[in-house]
Every structure is written in C-alpha cells, then in structure tokens.
Swiss-Prot record:
It catalyses: tRNA(Pro) + L-proline + ATP = L-prolyl-tRNA(Pro) + AMP + diphosphate. GO terms for biological process: prolyl-tRNA aminoacylation. This is Proline--tRNA ligase. InterPro entries: aa-tRNA-synt_IIb (IPR002314), aa-tRNA-synth_II (IPR006195), aa-tRNA-synth_II/BPL/LPL (IPR045864), Anticodon-bd (IPR004154), Anticodon-bd_dom_sf (IPR036621), Pro-tRNA-ligase_IIa (IPR002316), Pro-tRNA-synth_IIa_bac-type (IPR004500), Pro-tRNA-Synthase_IIa_type1 (IPR023717).
Amino acid sequence: MRVSKYLLSTQKETPANAEVISHQLMLRAGMIRRNASGLYSYLPTGLRVLRKVEAIVREEMNKAGAIEILMPMVQPADLWVETGRWDKFGPELLRFKDRHNRDFVLGPTHEEVITDLIRKEVSSYKQLPLNLYQIQTKFRDEVRPRFGVMRSREFLMKDAYSFHLDVDTMNETYEAMYQAYSNILSRMGLAFRPVLADTGSIGGSMSHEFHVLAQSGEDLIAYSTGSDYAANIEKAESPMPTEARGSATEELRLVDTPNAKTIAELVEQFGLDITKTVKTLIVKGATEEAPLVALIVRGDHELNEIKADKLDLVASPLEFAPEALIRDAIGAGPGSLGPVGLNMPIIIDHSVSVMSDFAAGANQDDKHYFGINWERDLPLAQAADIRNVVEGEPTPDGLGTYAMARGIEVGHIFQLGTNYSKSMNATVLDENGKSQVLLMGCYGVGVSRIVAAAIEQNFDDRGIVWPEAIAPFSVGILPMNMHKSHRVTDIAEQLYKDLSAAGIDVLLDDRKERPGVMFADMELIGIPHTVVIGDRNIDAGVFEYKNRRTGEKQDVPFDQIVDFLKNLQA
C-alpha cells in the first residue's frame, strides 16, 4: 500500500474527550472516528487491525471444530419473551417496532436466536454434539459508553454456541474452547490470563473469563504465585482461617465515638488495630420474615457483592438498605452499626468468626462497643465467604499465595446447561427415542475490544507498538527525499515490489513530506519494522532497519533485506 493512495488520517494532538490511552491512540492513529455516543466508523488502518484479529479468531474456531454461520442482528421480541429476558434484560436492550407494529430488538447477544434455530433444525442425537459460531455486530444501549471501542454501544463479537445431550461432550467442547481462546490470544502476542468467573446475567454453571493484562484494566484479577490458578476478584475464594478464636481478655464496654463515622477514623482516634474491628452492612433480605440482613466483614476487608448476592437469605440482585430504612429498623445510621443486640439475621465472613476482643458499632449513633467476644456477648453468627481476597493470602489450590493484576476482559466461556433450551423447549430424541432437553455452552470473544486491549498493553510515548500478528502493516518503507532522488525512488519502488511479492504487508510512504513527519506517523500507527532508504545508505549498499518495539537499528545489505524481514515474522 502506498500512503499517497491511502487514507492515513493521523493527528498530532490528543483528543480532549478520550479518557484511556487506547481511545486516544486509535483516534490519533486514524483508526476510528466517532459518529455518535458509543458509535464509531473504522478507517482503513483500524479496519486492517480488526480484520487481522477476526482472521485469527476464525482460524482457531475452525481448528477447534466449530462451524461458522451468520444470524441477524435484528431479532423478534417473541423469542426474548419466551426466555423471560424481554423483561429481565433492562434498558441495554434496544427495542423497536417495525411498520407492522411488531416488536423487535437489536441483538446484544444471540442465545434466543440460536436456540430457536437449533430446535427447528436438529431433531436427533445423531446430529450432536454441534458447535456453531458467528462473527457479528452486537448492540447494547449502554447508559454511558466510555473508553472508545472498549465500551461502545455497537461492537463486533465472535459468539459460539454448542449443543449436547450429555455432560461429557459439553465438557469436551468447553475444554476445546478454552484452548482455542488461549491460542487466539497467544497468537496475537498478548499477555493474558484465563480466570474463574461469575456467570453473570447469562447464567449457567462453569465459567471462565480471558483477560488481557493492562494497568488500565477495569477488572481486578487474583492469581496464584505458584500455579495457574486465577480468578476474577468476584469469584476468588477466600482462605478459611487456620487459627483458633482467641480467648476473651477484655470486658465489653460502650464507648462514645462522636467523630468516628468510618473504620479509618475509629482506628486513628482510638489507636485500634484495624484487624480488631468489623464493618456491618445492611442489605435487603429475600423473605418477608427477614426483610433486612446484616453482613459483617473485618475492618480491613471489603464485602464481595457477587458472593453476598448468592446467599439464600439475601435478596437478589443485592440491594443495600437505604439509611431511612436502617434507622427505622435499628435506631442508628451507617457508621454506628454492629452485631450486638441486632434483631435480624447476621451473616459474618469466616475471618470474623475467629475474632476476639473486637470493636463494632453499638447500634446507637456516635457509640461503639469495644471488647466484643462471640458466645459471651452474642451467639456466633452464621459464617460464609463474603469478602474479597487479599494479596499474600494462600490460594485454594495450596500452591502459592494471591497476587493481584488488572485485566481487560476480552473473552468469556460458559456452560449454560438447560437455561435456554428448557424455556424454549429445544429437545431432540435420544438413542432410545425419548425426548431430551439440550445442554448448551456459550463462548464469546470481543473482537473489537481486543483491538483496544492490545493497545492498552502495547504503547509508548510515541504511539502504538503493535504485536506482529495484528499490526496494520508489518513493514514501513521510508524513502528520504524520494521526490528529489531517482536512486532513492528506484530502490524504494523495487523494495516495495519485492516485499509485496514475498507476502509481506508493506506501507510505502511516498508523500512529499518532511522525514520527521514520516517517522512520527510510522511510530504512531505502530508498524513493527521500518526500512529507511537514503542516498547515504545507497552509497553503502545497505538499508537502515529499525525495530519499533526495541528501538534497535542495524544496517542490512540490499540482497538480504527480504529474507531478513521474513525471518523476523516467522
């Protein structure tokens, strides 16, 4: 490709409304342009990257035995009513009527459509197992689209759906998809971690997320320093206490604490050890008999809302009680709450169950109890894992301790079971002629999100530093003063032809432009390899090669340059 015949829409200035580096660089590198909130057009450079990501995803899915199809983005509302998600999904589901007053949606996902398709097309166990995928545009009407294509309303996604009659083949397909996703991200040259995850709104049992590691990642990943264990912070298991509860050494006493509204203030003002304090949080209960439930974690720990949401006594989705309701039920507000004398179900974290001589709110404004002890001052409450893990704690496999990293979720695989097939009556006849409800798996990759995540992991102060496999071009040719030197022109043109013939994606900057601008554009768009041609190089019979990632420069003889660049791509 010649720059003179290409739309290279680079910008010097960083756009003011771009919050994260990937959004900034995708705009500056001329990859995308905003049409409306959460809606973007891909320019040639951006589309080249997107298509390379898409090609790797497609190759690995095909290699894993999945079959490509294509389903409509517009879906009939009847299918969503059938599964109950018409009412459950919320405002992210964009609904509209056609000219015949029939309800439709713009698909944020395709479980309903694929299940409807399979129940009509598959009738016998002989047709199973089956794994179908598509690479299709999705639309979610995000309340606040952010971060460019990282969280846009319209995005490109690969979604696959597998169908089974038995758990064994469902597990086999799940493992195949796990490996395919690992292959996809490895081939793209990205540092990533597969992590145990919550199944979220889609539902199901087994679930893993695939995270590209980046400091800007929204998700916190807890991983083992001694094994492959990793989990989203929402899912990471807290270790059970190994120590026994200490004996009481203090008397229970009521203390005035007028200026201590938080744990931090309480600890500072009274010189307490934060591990000897607890936080009491009031949430709505699941039953009329227990409309409120108290959740208690140690003062230095954080409540894990996903874990709390799964407790039988707690209403789902988790909802914290408003202050007015708390005051009406307890007589005190947040900041002065505690377990002593509390007349509602109490669930404590396992770490709280072994505490002694601890401090908590007294359920009176501006007062706390110090020296609280279980089974002396109050019965030992029901214990559960309801907190986030902490760095340095032992991991569940016993092979290391927790460390933390931030990640950007780019893939998610689920075992859905019969969540959709049962509600939509998707059945087949088994080998005994009996009707059986299909088991399902669901496997998604954010194709456009990978592009942004790759940038978040690969950039410097000059621009993007693309991994080889997904760079818009592999090689950039920079002829110095091409329009003033016939020698430079002839050699640049010949190198362009030779590299193109060798199957290398090459961009020849044939503009009448200053060298500084040419170098800046090549570095901004992140081309991995640059070849500089000037009269001085020609006199020496060499090209000047520069590696974008390392900054390394070296002279390469004319007759060796093609093989040299091909070997770098191998």
